[in-house]
Amino acid sequence: SSAEKGSQEGKERPRQPVCCRSFFGRCLWPRIIDMKTLIIAEKPSVATDIARVIGGMKKNGDYYEGDEYIVGNALGHLLELACPEKYEVKRGKWTFAHLPVLPPEFDLKPIAKSAEKLKNLGKLIRRSDVGTIVNACDAGREGELIFRYIMQATKAKKPIKRLWLQSMTPGAIREAMHNLRSDEEMQPLAE
């Protein structure tokens, strides 16, 4: 499609050697695969719009996949903070006497109705042919938080880019795809 061709002008797709099988740590049949970019939107309608603009995508369960991109989505918040009772405070169970509870890092737990969606996104994130993850959640603090909670829960270690969408027109989506922002640039939104 024109969006794919435009984004790949003058660029070679990332490639990574992958071992099909190994025996005592030695690769028997090494092969090179083209790495894909996983785009995670905040809601299904946005994922559909992005997939439509990219073009050449096939619906595969609850995500879209093409030669270069996979487009999946959350359903808003998939995780929430664990209840205070889940934290061990001062060698005992939580009580009001222990307030405020300020652990170094808050634990997350899946929202029951969204647990399956989180599990499916985790599978996409861990795919060996996914080289980069793009945050296409809503532009703003809330969208940034939704995405970062997903990354934290799935223990994602892959490079992250930000698709900053302020409009859902095909032209705006194409423009944002050509101007992906770095994860470092978006860090202040998460704090």
Tell where the protein language model's regions lie, with residue ranges.
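Mature cores of small secreted peptide/protein domains
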Residues: 24-25, 32
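Cysteine-centered motifs
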Residues: 19-20, 27
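Serine residues within intrinsically disordered or low-complexity segments
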Residues: 1-2, 7, 22
